[in-house]
Amino acid sequence: MNDIAHNLAQVRDKISAAATRCGRSPEEITLLAVSKTKPASAIAEAIDAGQRQFGENYVQEGVDKIRHFQELGVTGLEWHFIGPLQSNKSRLVAEHFDWCHTIDRLRIATRLNDQRPAELPPLNVLIQINISDENSKSGIQLAELGELAAAVAELPRLRLRGLMAIPAPESEYVRQFAVARQMAVAFARLKTRYPTVDTLSLGMSDDMEAAIAAGSTMVRIGTAIFGARDYSKK
């Protein structure tokens, strides 16, 4: 078993244990392997180990990887864009990715809707919440969610699937859980209004257990699977 396969197995075990501890089924939680800055060869190892969902933060890098595996004839992969999205890059996301986690304004949602090719299924989208109110992070306030969700739900080439957040780092589990719980409450409320909503993208390596206990359905894990990132190649 190679390192990536071994790491994936360990992460899956941690997800399973965290779910079991809070009375949830491990099948309720999707593992999104964050492959930004990692070569296609590393992703291929993860694919060989059964991983199918991959998250990319940089548009062109992600598109290059998507095309690479399409040209190889690899099917069944699911590509998630999880980085900040600029208007001038929206077409590439609309044309190539399956998901976008970082909807934080109607203008970008409208562009994605208009640019999504008719022959593709609707683009799955999550609204990003700036749950820790950090100036350095994208996302809307929870108070703005109702208005943006209603507008996004009307766009026919998008499918509103739920919420995403990147909480500020917290070392204490109790504080991690409190923040995650705020997201879970907003997610539950959104689910009652929109039948397509089923995804809460919340939790990374350091706060995964708290996120799962609070109700996350998707955790985003990178370094614990692929090792430290090399940004010099970006």
Briefly describe each language-model feature range:
Residues M1-D206, A214, F226:
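Conserved alpha/beta-domain cores
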Residues M1-N2, S232-K234:
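Short, Lys/Arg-enriched, disordered terminal segments
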Residues A210-A213, I221, I225-S232:
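Expand to "…catalyze enediolate/carbanion chemistry for C-C bond making/breaking, isomerization
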Residues M218:
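Conserved N-terminal glycine/acidic-rich loop preference
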